C-alpha cells in the first residue's frame, strides 16, 4: 500500500525536511516486506488569502484516485501508536492500494474535505504547526512499520 502525505505549503531545506526524509526512507526500507510503501510527500501551493476552500480543491487534485483518505485534524481521533499501526495494517489487508494523509494549511482543512475523509487522526488536543505535523506523521508511519515487523524501535 503506497502512502502519500498530501500537504499544503512547501517545506524548505532544513532540519524538519531532513528528519521527514529520513523517517520516510526508513519506512520505505522496513515497510517493503510488510506490503507498505513507498511513501512520498505531495505538496500543494499555499495560496495566500485564498482560504481553506481553495486549498481543499488543490488537495483533492493531489489525491491519488481511489485512495483511502485520512485527515490530520484536531477534531480527529486520538489513537496510540500500536493502534495506528493496526489501522495501517487493516487498510493494507483490505486491499487498499493507496493511503493519502491530508494535512491542511495554517487554518486547517476545509469542512467539505474533512467530510470526505474515511478517517481522521489527531495528535492530541493541542494545535500543532502544519509543518510539525508532517514530521510527527512521518515518524509515526515509520514507527508503525517497526511495530508490525516486531522491531525493538517501539518500546512499551
Swiss-Prot record:
Record-given protein name: Ribosomal RNA large subunit methyltransferase H
Residues binding S-adenosyl-L-methionine, per UniProt: 72, 104, 123-128
NCBIfam families: PRK00103.2-2, PRK00103.2-3
Complex and partners: Homodimer.
Domain of life: Bacteria
Family affiliation: Belongs to the RNA methyltransferase RlmH family.
Organism from which the protein derives: Ruegeria sp. (strain TM1040)
Cellular localization per UniProt: Cytoplasm
Reactions accelerated catalytically: pseudouridine(1915) in 23S rRNA + S-adenosyl-L-methionine = N(3)-methylpseudouridine(1915) in 23S rRNA + S-adenosyl-L-homocysteine + H(+)
Keyword Cytoplasm: yes
Pfam families linked: SPOUT_MTase
Keywords: Cytoplasm, Methyltransferase, rRNA processing, S-adenosyl-L-methionine, Transferase
Cellular compartments per GO CC: cytoplasm
